Amino acid sequence: MTKFTKEQNQAINDYGKDILVSASAGSGKTTVLVERVLKRILSGTPVSSLLIITFTKAAAREMKERIKQKISDQIEKEPNNQFLRSQLLDVDTANISTIDSFCLDVIRRFYYVIDLDPQFSVLTDETQAELLKERALHEIEIEYLEKNDQDFQDFYDNFSGDRDAEGARNLLLQLYNTVVTEPNYEKFLNNLPNFYQVQDDLIESDLWQTQIKPLLIKEIKDLQTEIRQFFENPQMENPDLVKVKENYDIFTSRLEQFLNALEDDHSYNEIRASLMNCKFEKNIRKSKKWSEESLETYQESQKLKSDLNDQLKKIFANFFVVEEKEQVNILKKSEKLVKTIVDAEKKLIKRFGQLKREQNLIDYSDMEQFAFSILTTDTSNAHIAQEYYQEKFNEILIDEYQDVNALQENIIAAIKKKGQNNLFMVGDIKQSIYGFRQARPDLFLSKYHAYGQNDDSEKIVLSDNFRSTQRVTKTVNSLFNPILTANFGGIDYKKEGQLQFGATYYPTDLPTASEYIFTDKKQTQASFEENFGDEMDFSEIQMVIARIKQLKEENFQVWDRKTQLKRPLEYSDIAIITRTRSDNLQVMQEFAKADLPLFVTDAQNYFQTFELVMIMNYLRLIDNPQQDIPLVAVLRSPLFNFKEPELAQIRVKTRSGNFYNALTSFASVNSDLGQKCKNFLQQLESLRSFAATHRISELIWSIYERTHLLEIVTGLPNGQQRRVNLESLYERATSYESAGFKGLYQFISFIERMRKNQKDLAQPLLSDKADKAVKLMTIHASKGLEFPVVFVMGLGHKYQTRDLSGNFTISKDGLGLTIKEKDYRIDSLVKSLADVEKRQQMLEEEARILYVGLTRAQQKLILVASVSEMEAKQKKWESEIDQKTNILPLIRKINAQSPLDFLGPKLEQKHEFDQTIEDMTLALEEQDKIYYLKFAVQSDIEEKDEQKDDTQKLSSKMNDVVKTLYNFEYPFADATKTTAYQSVSEIKKVFNDPMDTELENSRLISSSNRYLQPIDETPVFLEKQKFTGAEIGTAMHLVLQYYDYQGDKTEINLEQEIEELVELGKLNPLMVPHLSKEALNWFVMSEFAAEFWQKPEKLHRESQFSSLVNASELFNDFSDSAAKILVHGTIDGYFETDEGLILFDYKTDFVDKTHEEQAIDKIKKKYTGQLRLYEQALNEISENKKVIGKYLILLDARKVVPVD
């Protein structure tokens, strides 16, 4: 007989109240649910009178099986109990299902209440659903255009580019996904414009008083708390630091003035001015005479100062970038647009519904909406459906309650009888990870904090973990104590969320040490990452493979709970868990090479696969061959095998114009390459003619036949899967045309929209070795599962924040818009507010996702990350956790860029982790550094030095070849158009003279189709070093960015500046020997910089800007001369004089001293376009003064060069 804990017994036996069970990972919540159901049945309650809602169909099936087993076990004890026998038969037809299945039952039973045809079918084909939605959107677009509706045109103009209407369409489609989870979507939509209602006095508006003001007050008070906690350090009373303290006193006084202006409702412009005054008066220098303690405290004060400045800059950028009059104008424009959007969204919902009804279809969102309407509709029989279910169900049990949305919450409330406390909810706020499905964890939190305060409700916390060894639970607790707090995640993990070790059945001699493996990315990989994005580093996969091999070789023992015996580790005991599935194919490839069995439970990232990118690029070419990026991608693909030297040869012959023209020109050359070009162009032209008279599906199949593409991909690794993927695209094209759609361009746009909206069309991965292989899955797919050994990979991956960088943000409360003005775009205050709130919500969910991943481990947890600049990261982490509270400050958490930003600070606390390097590193011949950390129980800690193992480095050339062949995050994924956003650092090379630029030296970034070229010849002082020229150049910029022109005008000052940057973690200490201090000192002592010393307050450095530039100035293949691109960049510096602004930019380009004049002239031409961009931007953002001079600071040549 199972022995339950006190809290589990409460969850099983307590009745008469609405009960919320907060069940941590591995706490046996399913067991408790099943036991509670059995107790109800044994007390005479039929299973048909219970409603049990699960999150997935698989969970519902498991629940039914476990209930049947429990009843069967009881029947063995009471063989004559006929009631139990009848209940055993009733379980299969009982209401144990997902919320969708329950809603479907409501609709089938009471369809007549909403006048629905009972012969409806459920629309399960996602592609068909998307196509119907596309048709609905297309029809309402036609309706607006036929009416020549100017408001609608203004809406489309604001959110779409000059070439298409995708921006506006995406807004409407994404808004649809949100509103259909609202219980009253019309009310939700009608309320959206209200956020923008404002009079001329912004401070009096509801938006300011109820939304922005409370947020800003909270943020400022959080900053004040950080300062106050820092000054609790007794060391701050040290006489050494008196000037530091005085500097902070001035700053805190200014911060208090800003807070008072906020709280006292000063005018917007006064509050803005007060914020602009919130800055530190001086840059206090340290002294070598200070004690070691004072120097350490000083460094901490400098880091805090930097953080405070950064946070205030964000507040300014979000809420005070323009003055009140302009803010009000933006809000009024936004309100008008939102009203148009609301009108269009209502039409879209209505028309989409009509199209479904015409085919007698309902989709999943209809199920919940229709069920809610049925349950709340006042018919002649007065809520007949609602009363039926209220009388039918004695109790409503809900699993995974943390993941319900607003509509589901209202459905549950509708079937709960008033005055009857019969609601039983089980969930864990720490495992709410479905925000993309509109899950509302705040609904769980509101009950969590309210239940138990009266006699009608009860809160039960299940914290005992029966899944994991003590080492695993200690690891998880140690890592999450600093992360999840009341102001981040809604729960104080240290007090209320910790796992309690309950799995006492494990033998004490099992190997259970948690491990953390760093692979230190080499600096030389930086340029590669620019091309291929933030994908998983190969070394991570190799580390995991090596560790798995070692575990097998050393006969690692696992505890088998079925046999209650130890046994050797099997591959199927191991799970590799990642945040996304984008790296699946790469992992599969490496495992295949290592001859290790691997089963992938998630479908791969379909749209990013090599074969899909290849065929989509070919379709883009057939639609329009005048596109350089897809053209080069197809030429380089295995279909045609053009090599880079061949492409360069083609470009050299025709240096101007697009690449298609160059290819056409070269086809006339009498050579093997000319014939190769001719053959390609003939096939392309033949396919274009074929496309004009045939269906899209026929075109796709014709490409397969003419290029033998199916045969080619079948011969590649994982070839059968690739073939299935290509056949799937053919099937989708057939479905597209069957739905009445036509046109190749439209089909490409449809597929692209599905890709961006993550509507993956992937086919299940083919495998027959699931039971004998290592499992690879995403964290989402792993939820609810457990494995003896778990590797959590990709912890260095950057979080995706694209949703916050677009032109609109949809939140649970509103719709934030970016407004297009004549020469720029600007976020409305509603957009800025939504971005701030959504960013924190996103990061809170990322922390919860991390928790889910780590708690899958039963016996051994291994965390894996590849990290660049490891030493600098470690130095940064050392001081991040507040030493008094042992909490990671909120400011750090809301600025987290990756999981490592959450975990690193705690991992760096050496008193909790035993840091060793073991002999596993001998199996890794291709790594440079490995940080291998074992978790140690507090009482077992011994001080040990961290060891580092320098081994042979992977050949960069071979690495590039392998990655090019098997990199499935294809570098030309967005081939039909460039991004609407470019950085100056990326486009500056476009201004180069074509004679100076060979195609073979050009690169294109996959994420946004941006131009990049490698740095030109390296200056003398940068040569033959560990770091690349670009990296050293960046470091030189960094020193000049922070150089203090109020200090001593000596070389010692420069040394102190560099030392301070290292101590702040801004500059890698290994970089220091490679800096050209002579060049740096030349500039700061130069005649040009003399005025900086006299008037340092007039010097502005690292000034960011955004500016609209004609796309045709940057890209040859932009046929639309009116097309514009938003360019974002950072100006190295400018200086204010009485006459105007002096603009300057540092360059570390090599200058050939033997031909200095010609070399400087070449560099000048190279960067003239860039500086003109800067000039344009600076003139736009400067109200009173214009640029009167532009200069290049050539550090290698020690020259200041004027630019026209």
Curated annotation (Swiss-Prot):
EC number(s) stated in the UniProt entry for this protein: 3.1.-.-, 5.6.2.4
Gene Ontology MF term list: 3'-5' DNA helicase activity; 3'-5' exonuclease activity; ATP binding; ATP hydrolysis activity; double-stranded DNA binding
Any coiled-coil regions, as ranges: none
Reaction catalysis annotation: Couples ATP hydrolysis with the unwinding of duplex DNA by translocating in the 3'-5' direction; ATP + H2O = ADP + phosphate + H(+)
Domain UvrD-like helicase C-terminal span(s) in chain numbering: 496-784
Pfam families: PDDEXK_1 (PF12705), UvrD-helicase (PF00580), UvrD_C (PF13361)
Protein family according to the UniProt entry: Belongs to the helicase family. AddA subfamily.
Protein name: ATP-dependent helicase/nuclease subunit A
Biological source species: Lactobacillus johnsonii (strain CNCM I-12250 / La1 / NCC 533)
